[in-house]
Amino acid sequence: MRTLGGFTFPCDAPVFVRVDFNVPMDEVGTITDDLRIRASLPTIESLLGRGAPLILISHLGRPVKNEQQGFSLKPCAERLSEYIGVNVPLVDFLDLDTKLYGELTRHLDKSGIVLFENIRFFAEETSKAQADRRILAEQLAPFAGAYVNDAFGASHRRHASVYELAQAFSNKAAGFLIESEMQAFSHLASEAKRPYTVILGGAKLSDKLRLIENILPTVDRLLLCGGMAFTFLAAQGCETGKSLLEESFIPEANKIIDFAKQNNVELILPVDVIEARSLTSPLGVVSKAESISYMGLDIGPETQSIFRNVIQDSKTVFWNGPAGLFENPSFSNGTRALLDALSSSSAFTFIGGGDTAAAVSLLGFDYGDFSHVSTGGGACLELLEGKILPALEVL
């Protein structure tokens, strides 16, 4: 994979930079967490500093045909303008014709940078038919002379702007964000100091099964929380009440438990939970994990203490998946306790993207409190599952 260190610019031709500005927004379109925009700045500022005219491409959300309201990248263009001190025009390029060349030239002559409107407004971007995606890539390619991918969070997709468009260029590279993400994953894979602890939460075991199978032989401790923990508790004969449970995966949970025992991996499950009658309950009660009557929605204080002690005794910690329903303040204490323990740890602390990264901001922590916070959710998991990311393979 070529990086920006070995990247050469075409004479006078713009450079496509595929960024990931898929940021959360509230109901009025205000960005609530701009981690992904800030993470793109080193690449953008470096290229601008070298005199390269930039055409940024990104997606936002999952717009459906003829429904574009709420999916415009305008707030992202405005936020990026604030960060780099240059007006970043948002260009609506739904008509890919010769008129666009003139519009792009005017904007690039003035600002040196533009942001194309949401690439997913083209149905071909996410089409399952490679021929459709290739058509879009072929329409876009003439507008630039080189291609840089810095959209780590989209690199597990075979979408036109990260896969087929990259294939259209011989002069291409990965941006600094992707480079830093891959360095962090390399650290986990080959340089992790021990004890090496992995914390996995989130809703379903089925979503993390391949990940667990891939990393279990390499770790010293596996801490399980969130909804997925109830499948393991049920496998051990615990009453899980109305908690999220994947009964069909209980045999898989038993296999993981047995493998951990045979390979001296310490597998730690919650010993107490915060349970409530519904997801919107204003208050939960502490219950022992083996006898839950209603819905377990967070780890309890005893489990928080156990997990905290394990983190303090670790040299490397990877965490993906919240400990509970952290969006509800009544069930956020477990996730907050893990963030607090990790932020004060001297270990190499890696926060897997998605909901876990969102919890950092929502619960009042700073991304700089941790060694690495990934900008990728699905991409992060697929790398840890041992998969090759398609968009990086074509770089």
Curated annotation (Swiss-Prot):
Cell cycle in keyword set: no
Sites where the protein binds ATP: K208, G296, E327, G353, G354, D355, T356
Record localization: Cytoplasm
Predominant place of localization: cytoplasm
One of the protein's GO biological processes: glycolytic process
UniProt-listed InterPro entries: Phosphoglycerate_kinase, Phosphoglycerate_kinase_N, Phosphoglycerate_kinase_sf
GO molecular function per UniProt: ADP binding; ATP binding; phosphoglycerate kinase activity
The keyword ATP-binding is annotated on this UniProt entry: yes
EC number(s) given by UniProt: 2.7.2.3
Catalytically driven reaction(s): (2R)-3-phosphoglycerate + ATP = (2R)-3-phospho-glyceroyl phosphate + ADP
Gene3D superfamilies, A to Z: Phosphoglycerate kinase, N-terminal domain
Family: Belongs to the phosphoglycerate kinase family.
Protein name stated in the entry: Phosphoglycerate kinase
Source organism: Tropheryma whipplei (strain Twist)
Native organism taxonomy: Bacteria, Bacillati, Actinomycetota, Actinomycetes, Micrococcales
